[in-house]
């Protein structure tokens, strides 16, 4: 088994209809694949958006709301409905699912970070599938672009996953926008994320979600620097999860850093909040940049 512990991330557009409402058929396609991988012995985590999509209709909104308060209210209703769909589908295959709602503060505070990691480890050991989302109802920052892409990368690094798979309706990473540029070429393998790669990513490509290819590239950076390989591939294919798990997906693969950052450096680099200032002389600057320490 090449990748035992896998984090899958599905965005809102991957589990909704064209009108923005939840698609039970798309969710069933995802859970069917998760169940098959679970039976094969994989340890699985699902980071799923979709709470707003699941809830706005129940509150009487005709379309996906725009105002923050309306989104948060929709998420409060929709998170339970979203979990109900996942739980019903997975339990029919004898799989226990667990809901975990996280926010930026859970990563910034080291004790909460360690507690979350401990809970996830127990769930995986007990063969449950944790289903994770941002805490949309109380977190304003979460509703901005990049939420669950970044969250999935942070979770993958936290639990030392063997693979992160970002499922999207935007088909892989190209050198340009394939919808407007017929000469755009798909990038199958990315060994280093540089400024050119970031430029290629562009902006959001979906009307129903909050993230685009650029947020996925940023998420891939976090995971790859932490030693976790990353796939970006289409959620529209019936066996996309299984293909990614076997390293056969028709998508863009990001090669991880050979020696991933240790847990302490991960936390400092990606999760902790910067406060105050530190001034160093030229000698210390050279030692820190070249050797990673000044003593």
From Swiss-Prot:
One of its GO terms (biological process) is L-proline biosynthetic process. It is found in: Cytoplasm. Pfam families: AA_kinase (PF00696). It catalyses: L-glutamate + ATP = L-glutamyl 5-phosphate + ADP. Its EC number is 2.7.2.11. InterPro entries: AceGlu_kinase-like_sf (IPR036393), Asp/Glu/Uridylate_kinase (IPR001048), G5K_ProB (IPR041739), Glu/AcGlu_kinase (IPR001057), Glu_5kinase (IPR011529), Glu_5kinase/COase_Synthase (IPR005715), Glutamate_5-kinase_CS (IPR019797). Substrate binds at residues 49, 136, 148. ATP binds at residues 9, 168-169, 210-216. HAMAP family: ProB (MF_00456). This is Glutamate 5-kinase. It comes from Neisseria gonorrhoeae (strain NCCP11945).
